[in-house]
Each structure stands twice: as structure tokens, then as C-alpha cells.
Amino acid sequence: LMRSSAASDVYKRQSVLDAITLRDAGRNATQIKQVLEEQKLDSSIYITLETLKYLKKGGRITPAAAAIGTVLNLKPVLQIQGEKLDAYSKTRGKKQAKRVMLKAMQNDLENRFAEYVKRGEMCLQSAYTGNQEEAEEFKKEIAEVFPGIEIVQNPLSLSVACHIGHGAIAVACSRKVVVE
């Protein structure tokens, strides 16, 4: 649930824009679906949580790990690359988590997606649960690291928020469809 919901929340807008681009280029529904499915793996999300409570409730971490993590102010950084959700890093505090996410995204854009970046085919997204003020601040931090790249920001859906809790923030990139 988390993988498909979180990723689809973040990329929904771009997928619609890509489908419109393909439709306007004369592609039929089957062709549009095929292109969107092929390109969905050309994406990356990094997300950090405010609390470990919901990971504990969902059985993703033990109560003991949640208690220790809370006392130490640990903030996990999770990643979704293509179809897979994984732990990326454990950080002390949200500030460090944001730095780790931005550095990871920079690495993805400079290495994994370098050819798409050169061709102007990558776009950035920011997402959050609940705290719009913090999300706006994080969007500014993203813009400082990636000047000149449009960043679209949207809240994550309630179906995702109930699994990760209030105060989560994410940075993501995805490949835009380019019709030749």
C-alpha cells in the first residue's frame, strides 16, 4: 500500500501532464499506458517522518525500536526507487534528515538520471503530510539546491498520511515524457 500510494500521490500530476502530451501527439490509450508504465521506474522519492509511532503501529518497526528511536530523536529517511520502499538512512533530527534527502536527490540527478537531466526531462516534486508551513520551508531549501528547476508541491493523501503520520516531508524526481 505505502509504495503505490505514496508514489502515485507524488507523481499523479506529472503523469496526467505526460498523458496529455502523449494524447496531443496522437498516441492512443494503449500507447499512453505503455509509455507511462515504462517511465514510472525513472523516479526517486526520499521521505522523512516526524514520528515513529505509525511505523510501529503498522508493524514496520518493533515497539522497542520505536521507543529507542524516539528517545534519540531518530528520523528515518525512506526511499522509493521504482517499485521498492526501503530504509535509506537514520538521522538525528529533522534538519539532518532534510540534508540527507537533498544530498541523495542531488546524487540521483547527477548520476542515475544524468542523461535525462541533460535533456531537460526530469522534474522535481515536494510532498508533505499536515504541516504546510514546514513543507513550504523545505520547498525553499530544495530550490536553493536545485536552482532554476520547477518544484511542484502537494500534500500526500490521507490514505498515505495514516501510515506515516503528520509532519512527514518528501522530495522526489520523475522523468517527464518528451515526444519526438
Predicted regions and their residues:
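Mixed-charge interfacial surface used for oligomerization/domain docking
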Residues: 9-180
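Single conserved hydrophobic/aromatic residue that forms the stacking wall/gate
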Residues: 1-7, 11
